[in-house]
A protein has these predicted regions:
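Short C-terminal tail/terminal secondary-structure segment
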Residues: 2-5, 232, 243-256
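Conserved glycine-rich cofactor-binding loop
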Residues: 12, 19-21
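Conserved glycine-rich Rossmann-like NAD(P)H-binding loop of the short-chain dehydrogenase/reductase
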Residues: 33-49
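Conserved mid-core segment of classical short-chain dehydrogenase/reductases
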Residues: 76, 98-113, 154-160, 200-204
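Catalytic Tyr-X3-Lys loop
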Residues: 90, 98, 105-125, 142, ...
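Amphipathic alpha-helical dimer-interface segment in Rossmann-like NAD(P)H-dependent oxidoreductases
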Residues: 102, 118-138, 176-177, 181, ...
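Catalytic loop of short-chain dehydrogenase/reductase
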Residues: 142-167, 172-173, 177-181
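Short, small/polar-rich loop/turn modules that mediate ligand/substrate recognition or access, typified
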Residues: 180-185, 242-244
């Protein structure tokens, strides 16, 4: 396998949503840095394809699929897979999530509850399951937030998504406080407009794409690999004095 600085050598990293663009890119990036990766996804085929990609590149990875992270039992089973296979958990990257978009007057009670379960509850359940083992390893948690937690866009009916991701940033700050005595660092990442499976259909609308790119200083979409690079920084000792914060990866959208 082509390696970089081996910044995660000997580390066991649990990454959720490895069937997606960012999850797959992160699994490969972490493996190239020496990590043993434990992935999961609701999509059996996509998750299996990522395992095959990582192993073909010479990396070490196992995966649980399908895995419903809104089910506490599945979260416990995922952590047990990591412990059974590699004996420890050093890094938890809560990347997975499903978004539902609708305006206030159109969103249903069921959609609101479903959005919360698939953006907030799953982070709580899995972090709770991993916490005793992260205490033992003085580990790291990285949570996936969103630029929507701090910005609103007139073209995007993101009430539930905005609310949930703001909650993730708050949860991150609280977890960092609770983890401080155990050497656990907790941070989050807020991506802007990243080309991924989740955004590709939105980008097919020229008006929407033009409006969003027009608010980006760098004038282009972000790449999944660019988010993975930030996740690597937060997961590694390179960020040993960083905790309780949110890092924005948005090409300058927030400041313009």
């Amino acid at each position: 396998m082509e390696t970089s600085g081996r910044r995660l050598s000997g580390k066991v990293c649990v990454i959720t949503g490895t069937g997606g663009s960012m999850g797959g890119a992160t699994a490969l990036r972490f493996a190239r840095e020496g990590a043993s990766v434990v992935g999961c996804d609701v999509s059996v085929e996509a998750a299996a394809a990522t395992v095959e990609m990582v192993r073909a590149a010479g990396g070490e990875m196992v995966s649980k699929q399908p895995c419903r992270l809104d089910d506490p039992a599945d979260c416990e089973a995922l952590i047990e897979l990591a412990l059974h296979t590699y004996g420890r958990v050093d890094v938890l990257f809560n990347l997975a999530g499903m978004q539902w978009f609708n305006w206030l007057e159109d969103i249903t009670d069921e959609e609101w509850d479903r959005a919360r379960r698939n953006e907030v509850d799953l982070v709580f359940y899995l972090t709770r399951a991993a916490w005793p083992h992260l205490k033992a390893s003085r580990g790291v948690v990285v949570n996936m937030a969103s630029l929507n937690a701090s910005l609103s866009f007139k073209t995007l009916p993101s009430l539930a998504h905005t609310t949930n991701k703001a909650g993730i940033i708050g949860m991150t700050r609280q977890l960092a406080m609770e983890g401080r005595e155990h050497g656990i660092r907790v941070n989050s990442i807020s991506p802007g407009l990243i080309e991924s499976n989740a955004t590709r259909h939105q980008l097919e609308d020229p008006e929407w794409a033009s409006a969003m790119l027009g608010k980006t200083l760098l004038g282009r979409l972000g790449r999944a690999e660019e988010v993975a690079n930030v996740a690597l920084f937060l997961a590694s000792d390179d960020s040993s004095y960083v905790t309780g914060t949110d890092i924005v990866v948005d090409g300058g959208m927030k400041v313009w």
